[in-house]
Amino acid sequence: MKPQVYHVDAFTSQPFRGNSAGVVFPADNLSEAQMQLIARELGHSETAFLLHSDDSDVRIRYFTPTVEVPICGHATVAAHYVRAKVLGLGNCTIWQTSLAGKHRVTIEKHNDDYRISLEQGTPGFEPPLEGETRAAIINALHLTEDDILPGLPIQVATTGHSKVMIPLKPEVDIDALSPDLNALTAISKKIGCNGFFPFQIRPGKNETDGRMFSPAIGIVEDPVTGNANGPMGAWLVHHNVLPHDGNVLRVKGHQGRALGRDGMIEVTVTIRDNQPEKVTISGTAVILFHAEWAIEL
């Protein structure tokens, strides 16, 4: 069977919104070099290749147009959405393996559609970025210290992939941000973190609006980012920013509006001793089209 190639918009139920990904299923007969060529040809920020696995339900490899990466949140949602549709799955929990390890994925079926949930890695936090580094980040975003939520740090947070959390006051016009990309690239090299995630909390709601800039790895702005919204949820618990019941915090993370690709990620943080213990990101997707690879590979 020739590989089937799918164009999927993830973290949205509306076509041409959310974050697009390529999905190739099945991909067992493809070499690594062929996967890289296909990812380059499709041109998505990430393309997911679904493979047989001996120690889990499915193995996924992720490629940008230039390099293989360990895992990708929106491409994972896209991949499992396609797999569930093709196989006609019902409600189930499965395990996937990737270069990032083994992860639990929950698939929920609602009215012939699917909601995909991915359990991310263990939350972690680096020391706050202070002094010249903090000032450089604020300047690179063309903000001032007065735009930052008072009493909270600019800090690298991770649930497997580190991102810089930059909490903004709600009155800041986040859609108007136009960062100095060269400056952000230089800061990335200095701190060893490629993603900058300014975000703000919607007043009176457990909802946020964010944007994600990663110029150091060739992504000027990512539309909707699982590997940013997940750590953000953990960061919000770590600093006790939003109210919760001591067991779970649920946050809706909105992103992509400034690009005309608005989407939403549901972030669920399991809490122990007032600290984040586990983070799960959830979302749906929409398949725009799929095709069979026409040439012999």
Curated annotation (Swiss-Prot):
Keyword terms of this UniProt record: Isomerase
SUPFAM superfamilies per record: Diaminopimelate epimerase-like (SSF54506)
Catalytic-site annotation from UniProt: E46
GO BP field: biosynthetic process
Enzyme Commission (EC) number: 5.1.-.-
Family: Belongs to the PhzF family.
Assembly, per entry: Homodimer and homotetramer.
Name under which the protein is recorded: Uncharacterized isomerase YddE
Source organism: Escherichia coli (strain K12)
Taxonomic placement: Bacteria, Pseudomonadati, Pseudomonadota, Gammaproteobacteria, Enterobacterales
